[in-house]
């Protein structure tokens, strides 16, 4: 469950601008603020089932966006490459502060 939550949080971060305001609100409350379906339903004065359906549809949309655009997959690949690069620099060029500084700046862009 934690793995799914983490994945949804990343997908939400990447694709939230493609969602409707209601979808953004429900996903934010459910995944980021850890609200229950019942709490969201109460806040928006809708049924728990309506919230559940909206979240499930939105999850499917986020997965579909990722399947087409691959932003999260590419992010993970860049993260792994940066880690390998940092390790290589630390082992081969431990005194090159400028090189390490450049890698750290690349990491900040992520």
Swiss-Prot record:
Gene3D superfamilies registered for this protein in UniProt: Winged helix-like DNA-binding domain superfamily/Winged helix DNA-binding domain (1.10.10.10)
Described purpose of this protein according to its UniProt entry: Might take part in the signal recognition particle (SRP) pathway. This is inferred from the conservation of its genetic proximity to ftsY/ffh. May be a regulatory protein.
One Pfam family this sequence matches: UPF0122
PANTHER family: UPF0122 PROTEIN CBO2450/CLC_2298, UPF0122 PROTEIN YLXM
Similarity comment: Belongs to the UPF0122 family.
Name of the molecule in the record: UPF0122 protein Aflv_1766
Species of origin: Anoxybacillus flavithermus (strain DSM 21510 / WK1)
């Amino acid at each position: 469950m934690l793995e799914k939550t983490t994945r949804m949080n990343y997908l939400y971060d990447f694709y939230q601008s493609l969602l409707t305001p209601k979808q953004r609100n429900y996903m934010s409350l459910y995944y980021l603020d850890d609200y229950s379906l019942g709490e969201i339903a109460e806040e928006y004065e809708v049924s728990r089932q309506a919230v559940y359906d909206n979240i499930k549809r939105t999850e499917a949309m986020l997965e579909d966006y990722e399947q087409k655009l691959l932003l999260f997959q590419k992010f993970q690949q860049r993260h792994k490459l940066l880690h390998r690069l940092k390790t290589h620099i630390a082992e081969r060029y431990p005194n090159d502060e400028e090189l390490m500084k450049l890698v750290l700046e690349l990491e900040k862009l992520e």
